[in-house]
């Protein structure tokens, strides 16, 4: 996997320049999935309720992206995931930031070379938003040292940032998960934007000098612009606000420039202090689509893929409001109750085509999240993973699972029907691990 580390160096030294990848070409590519409503990839993905891409006669031309994408493969580690205690019912972490050395060792020993640390800024930040507790940053320091020790790239990510978190779209009455939502909006409040930039200037100063082969910064998880006051008032006139109202395609794309402005502010502040730092932006909205307006910035763009949501989030508590919880047991390819294919490999190829176009223009890409919740049957999960990872291999892209230990991972998933192997006090899903290893070596 040294190839990935070498490729990283190319990203830092190559000038991306201008790109022919435009917003118009993106919309044209996205339109091949007419029935796919844009929803947050990390929360929901794309919901398929209509014909598959093949039924829509979508057959995007394949291209072979340049092999400059970092070939990083690995997992998300959640020790600083959220200060909201309800999440600990679903993910095995204590929110103490104590990233486990065994995780790094096993990830290395199993042939992987990447960890993403999706974190909640409130774990180390005072209510004034500008005071950072140095003691609470030390666990992140340790994780970076463990990455160096085991030859694993560490991606520092704000899963919750000042004024922005995709989890704030959830309805506690439906999910049963209490989320302490942001009180201000990074897109409309200059003070909050300054606080967001302050987080990244702090990290840039603290970790300056650590090469980008070892460390990268992921600005914010699955960016999404929530409805402003006028839009909320309009929604309320139509009736009770639903979770899906947050993910209206037209409104989200209309606000894309709001996110690019915020992303540029943070990236510029980082590079002012550490010009060589690799900066990563998730796709917009919700990690789903490339961002043409950021194509010339030198940032790597990251896709999160949980498509189709009916398969990847079957019976998942925190997508209630997008799914009902009464959906039938999924199959792969995904079919409706009459046997009609709703989503298959060709559908996924069409969904990923905008990312292929972006990569072909010289913009590095990576898939920073994916996976299937524990209630997806193991045979369906493995078939979906095999197709998805094979497509990502054709894109010359690395990828990471959400998560390592827990309901989306390879350890302690509690997935019914899986023949687990005892592994040093944990339950290992050996068939999934073997499949991941196969694709990580491809």
What do these predicted ranges mean?
Residues 22-39:
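N-terminal export leaders
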Residues 1-22, 36, 48:
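N-terminal secretory signal peptides
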Residues 78-99, 128, 312-345:
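Acidic/histidine-rich helix-loop elements
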Residues 177-341, 352-373, 394-397:
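Active-site region of glycoside hydrolase catalytic domains
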Residues 20, 41-67:
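C-terminal segment of N-terminal export signals and the immediately downstream linker at the start
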Residues 55-114:
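N-terminal carbohydrate-binding accessory modules
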Residues 102-163, 262, 271, 385-391:
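Aromatic-lined substrate-binding rim segments of carbohydrate-active enzymes
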Residues 377-442:
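Aromatic-rich peripheral "rim/lid" segments of glycoside hydrolase catalytic domains that contact
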């Amino acid at each position: 996997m040294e190839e990935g580390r070498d490729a990283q160096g190319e990203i830092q030294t190559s000038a991306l320049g201008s790109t022919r990848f435009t917003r118009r070409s993106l919309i044209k590519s996205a339109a091949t999935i007419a029935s796919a409503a844009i929803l947050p990839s990390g929360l929901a993905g794309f919901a398929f309720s209509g014909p598959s891409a093949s039924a829509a006669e979508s057959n995007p031309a394949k291209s072979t992206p340049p092999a400059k994408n970092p070939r990083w493969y690995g997992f998300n580690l959640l020790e600083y995931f959220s200060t909201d205690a309800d999440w600990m019912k679903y993910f095995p972490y204590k929110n103490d930031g104590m990233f486990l050395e065994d995780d790094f060792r096993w990830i290395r020993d199993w042939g992987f070379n990447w960890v993403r640390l999706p974190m909640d800024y409130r774990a180390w930040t005072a209510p004034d938003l500008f005071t950072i507790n140095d003691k609470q940053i030390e666990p992140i320091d340790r994780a970076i040292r463990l990455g160096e020790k085991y030859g694993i790239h560490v991606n520092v990510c704000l899963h919750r940032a000042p004024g922005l978190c995709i989890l704030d779209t959830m309805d506690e009455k439906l999910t049963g998960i209490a989320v302490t939502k942001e009180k201000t909006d990074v897109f409309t409040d200059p003070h909050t934007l300054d606080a967001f930039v302050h987080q990244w200037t702090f990290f840039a100063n603290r970790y300056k000098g650590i090469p980008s082969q070892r460390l990268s910064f992921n600005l914010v998880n699955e960016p999404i612009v929530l409805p402003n006051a006028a839009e909320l008032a309009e929604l309320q006139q139509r009736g009770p606000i639903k979770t899906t109202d947050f993910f209206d395609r037209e409104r989200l794309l209309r606000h894309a420039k709001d996110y690019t402005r915020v992303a540029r502010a943070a990236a510029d502040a980082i590079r002012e202090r550490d010009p060589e730092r690799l900066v990563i932006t998730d796709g917009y909205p919700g990690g789903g689509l490339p961002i043409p307006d950021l194509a010339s910035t030198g940032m790597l763009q990251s896709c999160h893929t949980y498509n189709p949501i009916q398969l990847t989030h079957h019976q998942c508590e925190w997508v209630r409001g997008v799914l009902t919880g009464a959906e039938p047991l999924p199959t792969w390819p995904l079919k409706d109750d009459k046997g009609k294919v709703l989503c298959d490999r060709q559908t996924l190829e069409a969904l990923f085509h905008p990312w292929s176009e972006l990569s072909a223009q010289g913009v590095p890409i990576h898939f920073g999240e994916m996976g299937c919740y524990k209630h997806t049957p193991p045979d369906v999960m493995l078939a979906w993973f095999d197709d998805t990872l094979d497509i990502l291999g054709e894109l010359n892209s690395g990828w990471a699972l959400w998560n390592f230990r827990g309901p989306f991972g390879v350890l302690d998933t509690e997935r019914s029907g899986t023949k687990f192997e005892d592994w040093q006090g944990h339950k290992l899903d050996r068939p999934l691990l073997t499949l991941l290893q196969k694709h990580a070596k491809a």
